[in-house]
Amino acid sequence: PTRRSSDLLLELHFSLLYLYFIYADYDKAIKQLKFLEQFNLRQLKQDLFASVQLIKLIIHYELDNRNLLPHLIRSVYRSLNESARLFEFERVLIQFMRSDLPKVTGGIATARAFNKLLLQLTKIQNDQYEQAAFIMFDIVAWLRSKIEHKPLLTVISEIKPA
């Protein structure tokens, strides 16, 4: 296959991953993750690689895989840092998952922690250099879903009506 057809195939599988993620079908999302991880995304599509890595962290958070998360966080940070650029968006999210999230006990404390992260990311989102990192993955919608205790699909529907 040509480079273009490979890119299209990867984008299709990323779209499926993101769709399963939005619908909270994490088992199917993990299957798409595994499929995408077979490719050297870092060489093919750097933006896709970064988004897949961050979504992987969040899926495992959603699945309550607390024992696996510290290892995944280190691995994702290392992978993104090796890619010659680490967006502030990525650094802040990884730092939050590494340091702040494990300290949160649930309920109001969780909502406050996610709100604090949302405020940090909202400031970053306005930076011209950082905007590209927000295109592939709507982290703001996911954070709002956590703060408002709503399904991600509902939050996205409210933001982008049909």
Give residue spans per PLM region.
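Short coil/turn linking the two alpha-helices of tandem helical-hairpin repeats
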Residues: 43, 62-64
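Inward-facing hydrophobic residues that define packing positions of alpha-helical scaffold repeats
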Residues: 32-40, 72-74
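C-terminal non-catalytic interaction modules
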Residues: 65-162
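Alpha-helical positions within canonical tetratricopeptide repeat
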Residues: 27-31, 68
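"A position-specific structural signal for the A-helix of alpha-solenoid helical repeats
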Residues: 8-22, 48-62
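Short, small-residue-biased leader/transition segments that mark boundaries at the very start
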Residues: 1-5
